[in-house]
């Protein structure tokens, strides 16, 4: 039912704006801003492929997702996130010690992230890094 109520897909410029704001809030440790950028019913899904640490079940809700993402940032303050293109869409690639650790893609509605997908599976990342 929620999908039927969704507006038109966000423009590329809007996705880039939200991803940049998300990156800035993450780097600043601004929990309140992270929550603001996430839709109340946001769903976070991670793919670790059984080879990388990743939540095995979807995480739902802005505060829960923001807490998860903030905790990851606190554990690894040296991470560097860059805006990249994946399958023709804007995404965030996060590097640790120069190595690609994960790629985040999002769906946006009304200026907020409604779906957050993280790929941390090293096999998929190797493929992405060599494209």
Q: What is each residue range found by the language model?
A:
Residues 62-131:
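Low-complexity, glycine/alanine/valine/leucine- and proline-rich hydrophobic stretches
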Residues 1-71:
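Solvent-exposed, charged amphipathic helical/linker segments at domain boundaries
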């Amino acid at each position: 039912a929620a999908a039927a109520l969704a507006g038109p897909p966000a423009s590329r410029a809007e996705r880039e704006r939200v991803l940049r704001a998300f990156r800035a809030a993450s780097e600043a440790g601004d929990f309140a801003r992270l929550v603001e950028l996430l839709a109340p019913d946001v769903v976070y899904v991670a793919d670790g492929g059984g080879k990388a640490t990743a939540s095995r079940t979807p995480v739902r809700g802005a505060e829960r997702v923001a807490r998860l993402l903030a905790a990851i940032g606190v554990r690894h303050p040296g991470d560097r996130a860059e805006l990249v293109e994946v399958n023709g869409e804007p995404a965030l690639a996060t590097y640790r010690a120069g190595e690609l650790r994960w790629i985040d893609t999002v769906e946006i509605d009304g200026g907020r992230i409604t779906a957050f997908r993280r790929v941390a599976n090293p096999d998929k990342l190797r493929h992405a890094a060599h494209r």
